[in-house]
Every structure is written in structure tokens, then in C-alpha cells.
């Protein structure tokens, strides 16, 4: 279970990971689905909150040459985020866009409790779907 927590946490940061595959593998090995869901959701939510913290911290360096986003790019991202609002964090589960959304929430200083709630809902839903699909499609193979 600790390995699932770590893989889920790393998968939620800007580092690559394969938490869905590991979750399905542990389910096939007979681990309880509810426990797998809770551990993966907690790890992935914590990883998302690490991204929020990185966004909050990184904003102070935006004038540095090495900062990864241009002033125009950051302004464009802020306009997009303000247009769709904090509810866009419900897409934090999605590959490619989810991690940058959590960083952007930090850059724009979304209150911690709201970031935590929205990210937890998104990540929990993601792993519920993964477990449902594993139970439906992988059961004959396990």
C-alpha cells in the first residue's frame, strides 16, 4: 500500500508516473478496492497540493530569466483560469492538463481548503473510475 501511495503522489506532481497501472495490479493481487481507492486518492491529492505549493512559491521568481513561463504566457493562463474559475480544478484528474492546473491554482493563490477539496474530489473520482474499469475488464484476467 505504501508503494501505491508513493506512486500516486509522484504521478500527481510534474514527474511522470503510472499510478493507474499500479492500482489495477494491486487490485488483481487481491487488495481491497476501498483501501486502494483511499490510499491512491490520498497520495494523488497530496501530490496535487504539492503542485499548488510550488505554484505559490514559484510566483516570486516570475521576473527571473529562467522562470518557465513568459509574462505573456502567465497572463494568458491567468485569463483562462479566471474565465473558467476554480471549478476548473475538477479537471485535475486529467492527463497533461491536470498538473499545470494545480500549479496555476497555486500561482493565483486559491485558498488551500478550496484547492484541497476540489483536487480531492477530482482525484477520488479518477481512481473510482479506474477501479470500476479494472473490476469490469480485468477480473477475468486476474
Stretches with model-predicted labels:
Residues 1-5, 28-100, 104-142:
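Membrane-interfacial helix-loop-helix
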Residues 20-24:
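Hydrophobic alpha-helical bundle signature of multipass membrane enzymes
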Residues 10-19, 91-98:
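Short helix-coil transition sites and intra-membrane helix breaks within transmembrane domains
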Amino acid at each position: 500500500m505504501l508503494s501505491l501511495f508513493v506512486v500516486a503522489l509522484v504521478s500527481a506532481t510534474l514527474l511522470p508516473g503510472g499510478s493507474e497501472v499500479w492500482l489495477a495490479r494491486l487490485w488483481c493481487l487481491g487488495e481491497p478496492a476501498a483501501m486502494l481507492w483511499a490510499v491512491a486518492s490520498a497520495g494523488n491529492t497530496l501530490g496535487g497540493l504539492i503542485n499548488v505549493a510550488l505554484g505559490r512559491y514559484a510566483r516570486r521568481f516570475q521576473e527571473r530569466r529562467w522562470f518557465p513561463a513568459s509574462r505573456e504566457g502567465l497572463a494568458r493562463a491567468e485569463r483562462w483560469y479566471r474565465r473558467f474559475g476554480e471549478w476548473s480544478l475538477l479537471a485535475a484528474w486529467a492527463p497533461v492538463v491536470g498538473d499545470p492546473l494545480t500549479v496555476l491554482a497555486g500561482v493565483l493563490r486559491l485558498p488551500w481548503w478550496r484547492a484541497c477539496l476540489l483536487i480531492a474530489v477530482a482525484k477520488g473520482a479518477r481512481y473510482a473510475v479506474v477501479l470500476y474499469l479494472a473490476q469490469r475488464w480485468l477480473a477475468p484476467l486476474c
